[in-house]
Amino acid sequence: MSSRRDVLAVVLVAALLPPALSRGLWLGHHGLGHGHGRWRAPHVGGHGQGQGPQQHAPLGGGGWSSAHATFYGGGDASGTMGGACGYGNLYSQGYGTNTAALSTALFNNGLSCGACFEVRCDAGGGGSHSCLPGSVVVTATNFCPPNNALPSDDGGWCNPPRAHFDMSQPVFQRIALFKAGIVPVSYRRVACQKKGGIRFTINGHSYFNLVLVTNVGGAGDVHAVAVKSERSAAWQALSRNWGQNWQSAALLDGQALSFRVTTGDGRSVVSNNAVPRGWSFGQTFSGAQFN
């Protein structure tokens, strides 16, 4: 089993005035070896619990595809906190340890953040001595960067065009033996089942509203967000800053806000007045949810 090298990444969200220049930047680095060096922000600890795959319905026809899986983050999954989707503390956000970093082929430049996948070890594909029965459902919360210094079949597991899941260690060990390190898997998209409504965390400052969208059910992968303030009758589209952080340069301070969230399957849900008057930056609010 190859040695691990965890390399911290830096998230820089810079707000520049005038508002038209406001934008966010993120930088990522990765190490060598398999299943390691994921994009990661500084993290905090905690504990959470995932959901079983039997509660999830297939999406897009439910067909299975082939990939490989490794693991990272340690036995308590503390090393999976942060990540390129911007979710931060995966425990407090409700994602728990049922998470994975996706290779370029699956990550879709961040638009796959929040998508749910059912994954099972493929004993017939060469993992007969390492596989455990059953399957798990993981949420995409991070990016597994390519490592062009290593061959795709010997350490560069996330190199394009490979489909690869770098899973948290606890969830990997539910489908395969720890000593295996890497196993062939089958996977398919499934519907995400979440408790409560979609959550909107508003960061930034006046004229730079950075809205983190989490706990999204259904397809899970947010592709568009729009906001409507109490002083406007029109919806204003937000632009994706990074991960699932969406930004607006409008002056929204103190107003009641409604949000419209659209996922990759084209479905939308509206959370009317999810944010009440008098809100403050840094607060999180709950809205409607996909059925």
Curated annotation (Swiss-Prot):
Family annotation (Gene3D superfamilies): Expansin, cellulose-binding-like domain, RlpA-like domain
Presence of keyword Disulfide bond: yes
Protein's GO biological process: plant-type cell wall loosening
Membrane topology annotation: Peripheral membrane protein
Domain Expansin-like CBD: 207-287
N-terminal signal peptide: 1-22
Intrachain disulfide bonds: C85-C113, C116-C192, C121-C131
GO cellular component, one term: extracellular region
Chief location of this protein within or outside the cell: secreted
UniProt key word Cell wall biogenesis/degradation: yes
InterPro entries cross-referenced by the UniProt entry: Expan_Lol_pI (IPR007118), Expansin (IPR002963), Expansin/allergen_DPBB_dom (IPR007112), Expansin_CBD (IPR007117), Expansin_CBD_sf (IPR036749), RlpA-like_DPBB (IPR009009), RlpA-like_sf (IPR036908)
Family to which the UniProt record says this protein belongs: Belongs to the expansin family. Expansin A subfamily.
Name of the protein: Expansin-A5
Organism of derivation: Oryza sativa subsp. japonica (Rice)
